[in-house]
């Protein structure tokens, strides 16, 4: 159904709630086939506040308001007490407190209720909200937690990650923090908390729609394992000129790599492990202090950073909350911040002094594969560049290093070609 057809439909004047515990297919099984809704919100929840129960699942509906939420509301208990919301709550979640708060503040104007609510809420959040007496409209606002949106002939879409709607439109924009988005069949509007209209800054993703599909593979992880050689090639090739590392296409000035006293690498999860490999690469060539810090702890310590310190932050999505907050802290101490991210225009990319985009394409499997290997390849290039600028290696040595890096995709292809052999070995070993 197109947007034009949506405009001709009678919009239901009620909020129909469907939620369950389990997989998305379990939710689909309880949804009505004859439902004539023209807009909806949904969320797959990883439990933070409260257990895995039907009552704790999103959306949460309180009075006139239905809401989904990605993030953590740090002062939810204080809000429940201040606004006397406890009697309205049936779940154990911080999210339901937000729904109850917005409902409490709602006096007919959805945007005004959201303005008042976000002024009270502390923490990270991305809200999508329905108001019963404003059918056919979705309202959204965020702080820190990611949110992207688009509008096209097939409809208006909003999500935490653009892979959710890339099959419909490659153009998208990142919803700015503390801006209220209104979405209808007629389009998307955006305004700041003072009510001033803001024009969305659209970007276009540069990978094909099939990159977000299994494309004949049994699952995404095996597909993404096989995509590693191409991903590494896409990442390193534009950054090699005359067999030397070159970041001119990234607009990274050569001076950025000069006069570096020490390096701190900040990341979470798999990206932190890539950082550990990067530490070895850089430290072995430069012989300067290199530390790796987990982002969730970095901002709670007094960082030993000065104006000659380089801070490298690593995040596949570019929206990892702890890493983003660590970057914001680092920016107060040094202008030498560099991010290694996979998503163009992401928050971490925008707030770094310089950004090194990896070209892994979307990584949908939970277990990281190609995103990790392109991060390691990026560190290899950086180590080589830093060593050259610090005069720790010669041009000839640098070319030897780069030649080795260029061979890595071929080595991976050779390993992957032996997959049938590895499969047989695994079957023999698994019950040994």
Regions found by a protein language model. Name each.
Residues 258-407:
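Glycine-rich phosphate-binding loops that contact phosphosugars or nucleotide phosphates
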Residues 311, 413-414:
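Glycine-rich phosphate-binding "P-loop"
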């Amino acid at each position: 159904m197109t947007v034009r057809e949506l405009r001709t439909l009678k919009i239901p004047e009620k909020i129909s709630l469907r939620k369950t515990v389990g997989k998305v297919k379990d939710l689909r099984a309880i949804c009505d086939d004859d439902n004539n809704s023209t807009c909806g919100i949904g969320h797959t929840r990883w439990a933070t506040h409260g257990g895995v129960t039907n009552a704790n699942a999103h959306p949460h509906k309180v009075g006139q308001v239905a809401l989904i939420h990605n993030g953590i509301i740090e002062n939810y208990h204080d809000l429940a007490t201040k606004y006397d919301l406890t009697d309205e709550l049936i779940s154990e979640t911080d999210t339901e407190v937000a729904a109850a708060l917005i409902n409490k503040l709602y006096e007919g104007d959805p945007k005004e209720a959201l303005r008042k609510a976000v002024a009270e809420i502390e923490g990270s959040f991305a809200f999508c909200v329905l108001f019963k007496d404003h059918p056919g409209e979705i309202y959204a606002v965020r702080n820190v937690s990611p949110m992207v949106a688009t509008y096209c002939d097939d409809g208006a879409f909003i999500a935490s990650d653009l892979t959710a709607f890339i099959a419909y439109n490659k153009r998208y924009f990142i919803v700015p923090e503390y801006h209220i988005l209104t979405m209808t069949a007629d389009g998307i509007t955006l305004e700041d908390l003072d009510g001033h209209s803001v024009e969305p800054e659209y970007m276009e993703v540069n990978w094909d729609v099939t990159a977000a599909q299994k494309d004949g593979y049994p699952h995404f992880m095996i597909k993404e394992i096989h995509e590693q050689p191409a991903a590494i090639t896409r990442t390193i090739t534009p950054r090699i000129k005359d067999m030397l590392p070159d970041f001119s296409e990234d607009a990274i000035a050569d001076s950025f790599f000069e006069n570096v006293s020490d390096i701190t690498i900040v990341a979470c999860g798999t990206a932190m492990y890539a950082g550990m490999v990067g530490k070895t690469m850089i430290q072995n060539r430069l012989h300067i202090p290199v530390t790796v810090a987990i982002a969730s702890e970095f901002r709670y310590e007094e960082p030993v950073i000065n104006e000659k310190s380089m801070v490298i932050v690593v995040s596949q999505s570019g929206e990892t909350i702890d890493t983003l907050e660590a970057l914001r802290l680092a920016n107060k101490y040094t202008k030498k911040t560099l991010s290694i991210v996979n998503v163009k225009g992401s928050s971490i990319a925008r707030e770094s002094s310089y950004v090194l985009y990896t070209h892994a394409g979307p990584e949908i499997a939970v277990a990281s594969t190609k995103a990790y290997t392109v991060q390691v390849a990026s560190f290899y290039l950086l180590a080589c560049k830093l060593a050259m600028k610090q005069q720790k290696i010669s041009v000839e040595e640098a070319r030897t290093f780069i030649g080795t890096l260029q061979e890595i995709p071929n080595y991976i292809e050779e390993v992957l070609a032996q997959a049938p052999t590895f499969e047989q070995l695994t079957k023999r070993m698994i019950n040994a």
